[in-house]
């Protein structure tokens, strides 16, 4: 995917959203754009650095990734009860997982996060808040497995004994987001020449 493109890129990793502030300091002017692994990290950049003008694109866990994961889980366990699965990616936005899986509710659109609803304080606490929900539901015996969109909490959930899954986006989808970023970079460079 990225190997097929004639671009230079650098990958920065974070453990929690609070790390993004410090990682961003390494994203110097030589970088023409930023691609993040989700709308939440992109939102954190906007909250920390309101003056950032470079294009920021992101890839989320898309609907196809969730359906692929749930199909895999159903193939492993035909009796899977979705009322006993906690999926923060839909629950955070008030969508019931069973309704989503059965096609009665769409996946929440998290491409644009409101700075009012998702302010800095909430964003800095959301990972631990969700970690706590997963662990509490697991320890209370209310769920048989968890699905999280926060890759940063997966190791801690596994350490706590929670049966947790992370729905990875497809290579094609990530490639599309890379193309979107490259197109946005090119568009902005052309605008500067006019």
Segments from the language model and where they lie:
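Alpha-helical/coil-rich non-catalytic "connector" segments in signaling and regulatory proteins
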Residues: 1-194
């Amino acid at each position: 995917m990225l190997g097929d493109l004639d671009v230079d890129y650098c990958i920065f990793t974070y453990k929690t959203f609070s790390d993004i502030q410090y990682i961003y300091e390494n994203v110097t002017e030589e970088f023409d754009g930023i691609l993040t692994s989700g709308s939440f990290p992109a939102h954190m950049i906007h909250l920390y650095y309101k003056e950032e003008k470079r294009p920021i694109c992101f890839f989320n866990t898309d609907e196809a990734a969730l359906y692929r994961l749930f199909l895999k889980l159903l193939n492993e366990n035909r009796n899977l009860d979705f009322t006993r699965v906690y999926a923060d990616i839909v629950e955070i936005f008030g969508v019931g997982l069973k309704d989503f899986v059965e096609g009665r509710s769409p996946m929440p659109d998290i491409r644009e996060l409101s700075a009012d609803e998702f302010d800095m304080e909430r964003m800095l606490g959301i990972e631990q808040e969700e970690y706590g929900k997963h662990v509490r539901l697991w320890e209370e015996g209310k769920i048989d497995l968890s699905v999280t969109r926060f890759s940063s909490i997966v190791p801690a959930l596994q350490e706590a004994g929670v049966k947790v899954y992370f729905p990875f986006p497809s290579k094609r989808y990530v490639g599309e987001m890379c193309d979107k970023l490259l197109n946005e970079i090119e568009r902005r460079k052309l605008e500067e020449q006019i």
